[in-house]
Amino acid sequence: FSVDYVNNKYASNIYGALQVDRKVVEVNADVKINEGMENFTIAHELGHIVLHVPKMDKNKMTECDFDSISKDNVVEKEADIFAACLLMPESNVKEAFYQIRNSRLLLKDNFIFRLIGRGSKRKRALNFASKIIKQGNFKVSKYAMINRLIGLGLIKGLRYQKNNVNSRV
């Protein structure tokens, strides 16, 4: 498989797609994403190649729309988990985390925090994720790191975060 950057093909909410018949991962060049999101997009599509392409009907291998294959998005979640584990190995994340903190981070919605300018749980999580990314030299988005920290049980009190390109944080 190779990686191609394509214009004028996908909607702005599609970062990447897999062209199975051509053995190409396509990245939507029309969407301005940072390096971390680009890395995650490519790793996500690689997850589909490893986890899902071997199970596909060989006679129907064209553009792969995994969203339509799975109504409950299990396939997409599996590709996300694959990408997270590939780009942010558990041992590396924990090492970076424990160099900054000695215990799990419990985020509470606290009126006092908002008064003194420390912001919402989401904002505090984004700031903390930025520190972990820098400490561990990870090349991922803040949202990807937050979700990995949640998945590893290192952040409590926050649900998985959906990345939104249009909200520049």
Regions found by a protein language model. Name each.
Residues 1-169:
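Active-site hotspot residues in diverse enzymes, especially metal/ion-binding acidic/histidine motifs
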